[in-house]
Structures are given as C-alpha cells and as structure tokens.
Design a protein with these regions (language model features):
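Short active-site loops of ABC-family nucleotide-binding domains
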Residues: 52, 61-62
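C-terminal lobe/lid and adjacent interdomain/linker elements of RecA-like ASCE P-loop ATPase modules
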Residues: 73-156, 164-171, 176
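Extended helical coiled-coil dimerization/tether regions that scaffold
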Residues: 1-39, 44-53, 77-84
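Acidic, Mg2+-coordinating catalytic modules of nucleic-acid enzymes
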Residues: 144-159, 163-316
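Walker B catalytic acidic pair
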Residues: 57-59
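Short, flexible loop segments at the rims of nucleotide/cofactor-binding pockets, characterized by
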Residues: 30-33, 134-138, 187-190
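Beta-sheet entry/capping signal
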Residues: 52-53, 90-92, 111, 157, ...
C-alpha cells in the first residue's frame, strides 16, 4: 500500500510515493513502476470535475490485477452522462485485460464495442437483441469468471457443453501440438446444450465466428441446433454450395432428409441393432424410451462397421 502526494515544484506537478509500512517517508516517483505513474494520471483525470469525456487506452498496462480491479471500480463509479454540478463523465476505454471487464448481467454487454479488424467496422450488440432475454444465456453470463471472459477477445470461440469437455480439448490440443489461443480461439463451457443456440447467436452479434462441440444427443434429439447454427446467411450459403455438389438443394434440406431417414430406421428397424445399441450408456440415460433409442442408435451407427445395409446406407 502506498500514499501518493502531488505538489507544485517550480511550476510543475511533482508526484511522490510513500509506503505505509515504512514510516510514511516519501520518495521520488522515478523509483516506482510505470504502471503506478500511469495510474496517477488516470485517477487525476477521473477526479477532475472539468473533464466531461475521457478516452483511456489500455489502462491495465504494468498494473497488478488488484490495482486493475481498483481502477475499474473508480472508472465505473464516475462513468455516466455529465450534468451540471456533477462529477460524472463519458468514458471510452480500450482494453485487452479481463480484469478491466465487469459483466454481471446480459444488459452489461450493450456497453461493449468489439473491434475485430482495422478493415472492419466496430460492432455493438443492438439493445433490442432477443438473445439477451434468454434465461439460459442470462444464467451463463451471471457465472462468467475471468477465464470465461477471455472468449470476448477471441475471434473464433469454441463452445463446449461443460468443464470435462474443456479438459479433453486442452489435452488433445497439447497432444497434437495445436495452438488454439494463438489461432484466435478460446474454449468456453456453456454448462449444457440448452443455451448453445442462443450463445451462438450472441457471439455472432459480436462479430465472432463460433464453433460448436456437443455430445451426440444434441443431434439425435432434434435438428434445433443444426437449424440455429446455419441461421446465418454467409455460413448457410457456404454449406449450401458444398451440399449442392452432391445433388442436394441445400444444407438444411440435406440435414432434414438424413434426420427423417434416421428416425424412420429407429422406428421401423430398431430390432436390427437393438442387441448392440442397448449396451450403450445412452440407452438408459433418460426416462424417455424414444430418446434413448435415438441416442444409442446414432452412436451405434457412428461406431460400428458391420451393420446391415439399411443402417450402413444412412452413413452415405
């Protein structure tokens, strides 16, 4: 802890510091780290009633996390619309530090402007975005920790269901010598697939390109996640071009045809794979018999090679 003293010295401001545990003896600012010197300048501007608008570029530079947290509190305290006889001021801050980001509810995201590239216009989430009202998304935002906030600085976040998926992805990344973070990616656990679709939409509103990694049940249960993921003109057009090369009208039509054929096989040809599928953990995971059949059947189709023609053909 330190005291800061600012005095006039030959027409200039002189900044001195004193350690509280060292007899309160002041010493020259030249002995302190540059971060503390920057902090003095920022605090002076924050406390100046004559300053109505303040632009701060990377205030976290050379500051310990605790001082960053303190500075963010001071910035938040004075931020607002300036009024007469009021100390509030408009503050625009550029940062690369999660310590300088405070998010406790989805509406807080409206204060952020995302700059992805010099050649692209900055992006701000519109205040009427329906995704902000999703209860699963609200729960996710309320639980965001410092590690989770790193995804806000990522261009291509990888969305997974839970912490165990993060562990597996990191292990695979290390084993295969993949540099996910250097490539602009960051793994974010959503804690379940219920909020996955809305989270994808939210990150696209930020100008990001999310990738989704989910368990098989997300595809066996319904096509909701598939439809929501391709609910983007650029991504759907690219997928449509790939689908058309194989004679399909589009990616969503292809997905629907495959899913309908799969559900028909589960309904009419279950006995052909029952002896294998019933051994899968998915078969007893829920109380819904049809869901159990679809989930275990999908995993069986993906894992087994020696199935009859009806089940093997769906792979093609």
């Amino acid at each position: 802890k330190r005291n800061i003293k600012i005095d006039w010295d030959a027409g200039n401001l002189k900044v001195s510091f004193a350690r509280l545990d060292n007899g309160n003896s002041y010493y020259s600012s030249g002995r302190e780290a540059s971060g503390l010197l920057h902090l003095v300048g920022i605090l002076s501007a924050l406390y100046d009633d004559e300053v109505g608008v303040l632009l701060i570029d990377e205030p976290e530079v050379s500051l310990h996390p605790q001082l960053q947290a303190f500075l963010l509190k001071e910035i938040t305290r004075v931020a607002g619309i300036p009024k007469q006889n009021d100390y509030k001021k408009i503050i625009v801050m550029a940062t690369h530090s999660t310590e300088m980001i405070k998010i406790s509810k989805t509406d807080d995201l409206l204060s952020f402007i995302f700059c992805n590239d010099l050649k692209e216009a900055p992006i701000q989430i519109p205040k009427d975005a329906g995704e902000l009202q999703n209860k699963h998304l609200k729960s996710l935002v309320a639980r965001l920790g410092q590690e989770h906030k790193l995804v806000l600085f990522s261009r291509t976040p990888l969305l997974v269901e839970g912490p165990s998926d993060v562990i597996i992805c990191n292990a695979l990344s290390d084993k295969l010598d993949l540099n996910l973070e250097a490539a602009g990616s960051q793994i974010l656990p959503i804690n379940g697939k219920e909020a996955m679709s809305e989270t994808v939409k939210l990150f696209r509103l930020m100008g990001k390109i999310p990738t989704v990694l989910v368990d098989a049940d997300a595809f066996a249960d319904s096509l909701n996640l598939v439809r929501d993921y391709f609910h983007n003109e650029q991504i759907q057009n690219a997928a449509d071009r790939l689908a058309s090369k194989n004679g399909h009208s589009g990616i969503l039509a292809l997905a629907k045809n495959i899913y309908d054929d799969f559900c028909s096989l589960v309904q009419n040809n279950w006995d052909d794979i029952a002896n294998i599928a019933q051994n899968h953990s998915y078969f007893t995971l829920s109380e819904n018999e049809l869901l159990n059949k679809k989930r275990s059947a999908l995993c069986t189709v993906l894992n087994e090679q020696n199935l009859n023609d009806d089940w093997n053909n769906i792979k093609k």
